[in-house]
């Protein structure tokens, strides 16, 4: 959590400058504009940075190399998703000073890791994101990085300063780990903007914030708290934190109770889970509900059942995913004021200062939209920022697109709608073209739902 003390910045910078990744075996020799000014790029504040001049910065070109991690991307996209390739440029991996060690990528055992990708053919923009869930900096390479790089954007992603199921152990006070997510995202944005200027000769003309799930939360938080850094953002099913609820800790206990046989379907509907999403519940019982409730409850309310999860969420997959029985009766509203204050430290307000597009699937069975983005949209409206917000419900969308492969007759991937939303945001910001009004994007009865999505679908209905 805390920056490492006792390492002078000048020494850290010299160390960073002295290191470089070995060039990829198939990398073209640097020349002309390929990786120009590579030797001038320094990531401000980084304790370590390693640069590599690569023939392709997309997941197609990086597969099997140290420059991406396909395992950390698992489940986020549908199997048939088409991605662009052939984007040469410079990749910088590194980390900022930090005293926690959850992230073992590159064998560093050091948190606050980041990746910055600088394509040779730059369009003048920068896209920043934070990892979804408790994943790490390469998690959205296929979902986000590939497409924006192909469009000419520089790209930067952070591991948020902690990762993995034991992330809640980071810090000294309840809420510290998640508060660090926000600080690390701001830190990387500022540093990436300067790195971009060093590489291309001027600062980015546009900077966009975006992300999935916890990355969507970060997008909301950044546009509320640091609008000066960004020109807009796309929020893909961002997690909602509010001090008095709703939040994850007001809906997931009921899901845990149902898993353990002490809650009914009607109880699930009452806390926001959608009718029609029941076919997804058995999977979420095994993969999401128990672990998500216990680790986020441990982050904000460690005094409740301190032995579960305790010092670790578990050492095996079964132990990590298993629910804590006491979570079935967890009552966030009745918890001490200190718990609500811990959540308040990272809570959202709806007071966005830049244009924001939110997407949320109507069959999300982890963060049900009725207890999340529906509420956030009302918060934005109540704060007087409604003109800066668009909210699209994706019919047939769920929390991770990978489930489409199991239920292609019931679901649709959100990624193609996300790509359309990003294009709409850019047109909104740069051309003044307002996106369609809030509506539900209907699931088409045919066609290519894996790689196409029209936000202005004629089958849309008003929110």
Tell where the protein language model's regions lie, with residue ranges.
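C-terminal subdomain of alpha/beta-hydrolase-fold enzymes, centered on the catalytic histidine
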Residues: 304-462
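Proline/glycine-enriched tight loop/beta-turn segments at coil->beta junctions
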Residues: 108-113, 119-126, 204, 351-353
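Accessory cap/linker subdomain of secreted extracellular hydrolases
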Residues: 31-104, 109-112, 238-351, 440, ...
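Primarily recognizes the serine-hydrolase "nucleophile elbow" in alpha/beta-hydrolase
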Residues: 136, 206-255
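Short, solvent-exposed loop/turn and secondary-structure capping segments
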Residues: 138-144, 166-171, 175, 220-225, ...
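Cap/lid segment of the alpha/beta-hydrolase catalytic domain
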Residues: 129-190, 198, 403-409
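Secretory targeting and sorting signals
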Residues: 1-29
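Gly/Ser-rich "nucleophile elbow"/oxyanion-hole loop immediately N-terminal to the catalytic nucleophile
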Residues: 118-123, 174-183, 191-213
